[in-house]
């Protein structure tokens, strides 16, 4: 594996503290689907991986958690950066990945190609981190489900075409299914598999 100059930089300055802080912020966001949260700890991975996605990768990935990266991220050196800072192994098999990362504007694979867990072990599934251009300014979507009072509206910009249909198929697998973290810059928005998504007015 070739290492580049940016392989060794951009990690957490205080790995234990920074990982704990980021983990709490991600878990809080996952418990409040649709809410936009700020990842306050700095991480500077090689582009096109953004700072929030980078901090999440540093926090959640290790030698026991296979990670899937988009081809653009591998080409940009994210695989080497992740290996140096976390020891995580990158897998080409999306069904083996504990976590997956797709850059903004990248080709989002069908969610069904990731690990969706089993009826007995639904937690053995992939958490997908999808980067977007922004978490606002897109087509309005309505969310309902646990952690949401009545209903909530979001409007992420840059979601895959027919995302609502893709997500509906994922929700139908419950308790199986993938969980999704949308990231833009230093901000995230979480969609656990329990959250139903519909186009506003549909």
Mark where each language-model region is:
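Internal, well-folded beta-alpha domain core
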Residues: 75-190, 195, 200-202
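N-terminal, charge-rich interaction modules
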Residues: 1-66, 70-73, 84, 185-187, ...
């Amino acid at each position: 594996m070739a290492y580049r100059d940016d392989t060794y930089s951009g990690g957490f300055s205080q790995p234990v503290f920074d990982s704990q802080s980021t983990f709490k912020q991600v878990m809080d966001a996952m418990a409040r689907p649709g809410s936009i949260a700020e990842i306050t700890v700095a991480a500077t991975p090689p582009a096109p991986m953004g700072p929030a996605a980078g901090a999440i990768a540093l926090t959640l990935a290790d030698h026991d958690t296979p990670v899937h990266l988009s081809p653009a991220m591998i080409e940009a050196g994210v695989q080497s950066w992740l290996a140096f800072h976390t020891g995580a192994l990158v897998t080409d098999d999306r069904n083996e990945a504990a976590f997956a990362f797709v850059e903004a504007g990248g080709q989002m694979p069908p969610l069904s190609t990731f690990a969706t867990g089993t009826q007995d072990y639904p937690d053995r599934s992939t958490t997908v981190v999808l980067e977007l251009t922004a978490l606002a300014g897109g087509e309005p979507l309505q969310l309902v489900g646990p952690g949401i009072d009545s209903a909530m509206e979001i409007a992420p910009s840059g979601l895959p075409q027919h995302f609502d249909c893709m997500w509906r198929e994922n929700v139908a697998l419950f308790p199986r299914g993938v969980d999704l973290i949308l990231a833009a810059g230093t901000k995230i928005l979480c969609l656990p598999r329990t959250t139903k998504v519909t186009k506003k007015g549909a």
